[in-house]
C-alpha cells in the first residue's frame, strides 16, 4: 500500500448501539444489508441472514409488514447471531410486538405510525428495552405536502422531512436514533446528507436507494457513498442492489477498503491486461477472489502480467506477482524473492503463499 494516506476527518456524532454493534462516534463504519425473502418463510430468511453473516454483515434488516411476519421474526431472531433491524411502516403494534421478541433496532418513521399516543407507546417501549430507532426518509415516499411545497424531491425537502421526525423524538426526549435521507439520484442523496450532517448530531445511515442492478448499482453507490465518506460523513451504510444481498455486503466493504476507512479480506491490485501479459491475469484474479473469500485479514496482493508496472506495484504490496517468460517473479512484503512461480500454476502457488502469510498473523482474525 502506498505510504500516501490522506486524512479523512470524521464528522462528530453521538454513539448508539444496534445490539452489540456501535454506530457513530469513533466506531468503525458498519456495513449492513436487508433480506429479500418472505419474512414468513423462516427457513429461507434464516439461511439468507447466515449467508450475510458469513461475508461480514454487521447488521441485517428484515421487513416486518404484518403480525404474521412479526411472529416469524421471533423464530428468526432465535436462530441468528447478527443484530437485526425490523423495518416497519404504519402499524405501531408490530413495533411493540418485535420489541418483545428482542429486536435490536426499529426502522420506523414516527410521523407515519398514527396518533401521538401510538408514537409515544413505541418510543417508551424502545426506551425501556434500550432499542434504538432509525428514521428513514426516502425521496420516493416524500410526504405529499412537501412534494407540493417543493415541487419535487429536493435536498431541502428531504431534510425537512427528516427533521419533522427528529422533532417528534426530541419532544419525547428520545435520542437513541440514527437517520437516513436516501434517494436514487446520486447528487440529490449526497446534498441531502450534507445538509443533514450539519443539522443534527445523531449517526447517519448512508445509502443510494434503488441504485439498480449489480454493476450499475455498485457504481452509483461507490460514487455517492464515496463522496460522503471522503468528507467524513456517514456511520453505517447499505449498498442497495437489485441482486443477491450478499453482493451488497461485498460492495460495501470494497467501498470502505478503497478509501482505506475499513479493510476486510484481500485487496487485489490487478492490471487490465494487454498483449504483454505473460500469464492469464484475469483468470488468476477471478479464481483467487472465489477461493479466498473466507479470508478476513486485510492484505494487499498485486497481480500484474508484465514487468512494466509489476515490480513497482509489488514493492508496496504484502504479496505480489510480476509476469515473466514462463516463470513469474514473486514478492513478499515488498521484497523480491528468489523463488519464481510457474506461469501455468500461479493460482495454486499464490493461494498457498497468501494462506501461509495469513496463518502467521493473528489466528483469531484470519478466516471466517
Swiss-Prot record:
Biological process, per Gene Ontology: isopentenyl diphosphate biosynthetic process, methylerythritol 4-phosphate pathway; terpenoid biosynthetic process
Keyword Lipoprotein included in the entry's annotation: no
Keyword Metal-binding: yes
EC number in record: 1.17.7.3
GO molecular function, one term: 4-hydroxy-3-methylbut-2-en-1-yl diphosphate synthase activity (ferredoxin)
Similarity remark: Belongs to the IspG family.
Name of the protein in question: 4-hydroxy-3-methylbut-2-en-1-yl diphosphate synthase (flavodoxin)
Species this chain originates from: Haemophilus influenzae (strain ATCC 51907 / DSM 11121 / KW20 / Rd)
Lineage of producing organism: Bacteria, Pseudomonadati, Pseudomonadota, Gammaproteobacteria, Pasteurellales
Amino acid at each position: 500500500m502506498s505510504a500516501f494516506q490522506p486524512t479523512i476527518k470524521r464528522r462528530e456524532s453521538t454513539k448508539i448501539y444496534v445490539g452489540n454493534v456501535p454506530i457513530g462516534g469513533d466506531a468503525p463504519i458498519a456495513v449492513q444489508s436487508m433480506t429479500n425473502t418472505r419474512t414468513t418463510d423462516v427457513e429461507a430468511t434464516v439461511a439468507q441472514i447466515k449467508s450475510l453473516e458469513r461475508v461480514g454483515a454487521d447488521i441485517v434488516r428484515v421487513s416486518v409488514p404484518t403480525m404474521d411476519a412479526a411472529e416469524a421474526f421471533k423464530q428468526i431472531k432465535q436462530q441468528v447471531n447478527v443484530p437485526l433491524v425490523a423495518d416497519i411502516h404504519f402499524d405501531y403494534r408490530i413495533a411493540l410486538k418485535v420489541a418483545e421478541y428482542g429486536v435490536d433496532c426499529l426502522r420506523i418513521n414516527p410521523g407515519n405510525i398514527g396518533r401521538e399516543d401510538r408514537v409515544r407507546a413505541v418510543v417508551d417501549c424502545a426506551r425501556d428495552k434500550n432499542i434504538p430507532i432509525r428514521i428513514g426518509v426516502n425521496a420516493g415516499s416524500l410526504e405529499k405536502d412537501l412534494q407540493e411545497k417543493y415541487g419535487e424531491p429536493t435536498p431541502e425537502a428531504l431534510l425537512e422531512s427528516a427533521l419533522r421526525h427528529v422533532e417528534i423524538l426530541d419532544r419525547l426526549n428520545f435520542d437513541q436514533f440514527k437517520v437516513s435521507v436516501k434517494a436514487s439520484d446520486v447528487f440529490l442523496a449526497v446534498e441531502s446528507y450534507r445538509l443533514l450532517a450539519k443539522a443534527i448530531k445523531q449517526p447517519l445511515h448512508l445509502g443510494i436507494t434503488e441504485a439498480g442492478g449489480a454493476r450499475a448499482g455498485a457504481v452509483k453507490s461507490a460514487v455517492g457513498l464515496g463522496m460522503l465518506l471522503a468528507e467524513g460523513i456517514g456511520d453505517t451504510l447499505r449498498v442497495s442492489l437489485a441482486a443477491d444481498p450478499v453482493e451488497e455486503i461485498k460492495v460495501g466493504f470494497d467501498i470502505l477498503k478503497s478509501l482505506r476507512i475499513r479493510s476486510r479480506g484481500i485487496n487485489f491490485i490487478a492490471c487490465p491486461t494487454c498483449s504483454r501479459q505473460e500469464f492469464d491475469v484475469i483468470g488468476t484474479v477471478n479464481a483467487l477472489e472465489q477461493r479466498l473469500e473466507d479470508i478476513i485479514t486485510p492484505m494487499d496482493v498485486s497481480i500484474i502480467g508484465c514487468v512494466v508496472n509489476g515490480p513497482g506495484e509489488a514493492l508496496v504490496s504484502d504479496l505480489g506477482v510480476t509476469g515473466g517468460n514462463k516463470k513469474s517473479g514473486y514478492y513478499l512484503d515488498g521484497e523480491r524473492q528468489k523463488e519464481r512461480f510457474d506461469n501455468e500454476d500461479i493460482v495454486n502457488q499464490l493461494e498457498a503463499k497468501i494462506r501461509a502469510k495469513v496463518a502467521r498473523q493473528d489466528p483469531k482474525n484470519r478466516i471466517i
